[in-house]
């Protein structure tokens, strides 16, 4: 089906270009933060440090969960998967941005652009599904504590993880397939620091209304479904906690769920505003800042958010550190 769509869209593009006798652009310029040329070196160093800390933090968390048998439970399986996705998301965007800070040419080929876009949509969507899965896991742990081992079996956890990654891949394939109908013949300037769908649609000389509709339908559906799952899960958790009227239980629930709620807020806030304001042609700078937050800053913060207030993770880290000294 995907190959058929690609064939149809490529054929349509070639026919349109033959009719218009236009020149097809196959390279683009990522403007990024070019409007601040005096800050190139400081920005390069800042983002390099952020990227290194992000990779070390997320990979370190994965290794910690993998090595400690006490962390081989669903909650940490999902957390390790989130750390992997965060490291992948940051690696999709940051290296190219760092190269562009130092390179004279800011060019990116169409094929490179499509690969980056595909990787970005896959990781961003997968993270949405993972955050929803983690909310469901917390719901079962708090509201159905006695049945938790029965419900959250290894088989179910693996299925939820696989579905999250498949959902991310399918979402990316849909937008990638529809992007083959686009042609670029007027401008090759992408007002962004990576290849994203909205900036590409803005410079396309093909009618991109179908693509905008696909973004609205599919990206909107993913956000509504995952945010809805998270809100329902935590609403039930809240009522369950209030019914128990136990200070100790409330503290434990807040400690367990607080990190996840903070991560969800930081991630979905800019992501939602980005697509709500994407139709505005004046929103380029704001769009870049929102994108920077959920592609670079959130992957940096997540390991800290989930680790600093988690006694099990801290104890595991201390134990592993002492054993290696």
From Swiss-Prot:
Membrane disposition: Multi-pass membrane protein
Disulfide bonds: 113-205
Location(s), subcellular: Cell membrane
InterPro entries: GPCR_Rhodpsn, GPCR_Rhodpsn_7TM, Olfact_rcpt
Domain of life according to the entry: Eukaryota
Chief place of localization: membrane
Transmembrane segments: 42-62, 71-91, 116-136, 156-176, 213-233, 254-274, 288-308
UniProt KW Ubl conjugation keyword: no
GO terms, molecular function: G protein-coupled receptor activity; odorant binding; olfactory receptor activity
Entry keywords, A to Z: Cell membrane, Disulfide bond, G-protein coupled receptor, Glycoprotein, Membrane, Olfaction, Receptor, Sensory transduction, Transducer, Transmembrane, Transmembrane helix
GO cellular component terms, A-Z: plasma membrane
Family, similarity comment: Belongs to the G-protein coupled receptor 1 family.
Its biological purpose: Odorant receptor.
Protein name: Olfactory receptor 5H6
Organism (species): Homo sapiens (Human)
Record gene name: OR5H6
